[in-house]
Amino acid sequence: MEIKFKTSIILCLLTLLAINSSAQEIVKQFTKDSYSIQKLQDLKKEFGTNKIIPTLYEPQILIALSYFPELKNTTIEFRLKKTNTPLSSRPNLLGLLQSSKKRRYIITISEATNSRLEPILLKNLNFNAQIGVLGHELSHVSDYMNKGFGKMTNLLWIEIFSKKQVDKFETRTDHICINHGLGYQLLDWSSSVRKNLNIEYWRGADNLQYMTKKERYLNPETIIQVLKSKALYNEVTSLNIQKNQHDN
């Protein structure tokens, strides 16, 4: 019994070390010049396996993917399409019947939508905010990876019949994104949405026409408070982004 206990402790420590070693540096502000061409090629080699990535957004997607090491071998297609919702993520329908690790996931990036939502399409966000919302969508995929057929079916039911539960689901997804190290990018996206749409509360594209004080996604003030409560972010007060270029 004692040997088994010690073995369990060792395994836990090794797991924590593995997670720590794969963790990315917390960066407050990414720009198009943050990484060299060689660095982006390295990211593609490490995180681009089983990924279909549109060239237009390749740097942003690769940077976001680098914060989700658990998705290294996951099949994900980033698809450009004209849709009302600026971004969305889901497993392919047949994938619901497969184990989570064998599923193919689709992240749809809208190229055109109605005039009201046009300002928050990915192409109209700044580079840092783009990484933030992509991190949110990858957080969905990471979450889906832990859900079997039953839980995924329940999630579908929630999306159709319970706005309140969807609010909780999206809020939790924002927390997943923050815990993966993209809190500042999520903050940039959250601020950009409210600024670009000239709104105070954001409950998603499908609820834009309704005046409501309910939040589906974390607002900037809440994100700031969450970041302050995380040791991971307290250790970072400022960062010269050019450091990433000098490292290559």
Regions inferred by a protein language model and the residue ranges of each:
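Post-HEXXH active-site segment of zinc metalloproteases
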Residues: N128, D143-T171
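Residues that cap or delimit alpha-helices
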Residues: I61, L65, P69, R116, ...
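A metal-dependent hydrolase signature that marks the N-terminal structural subdomain at the beginning
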Residues: S22-S100
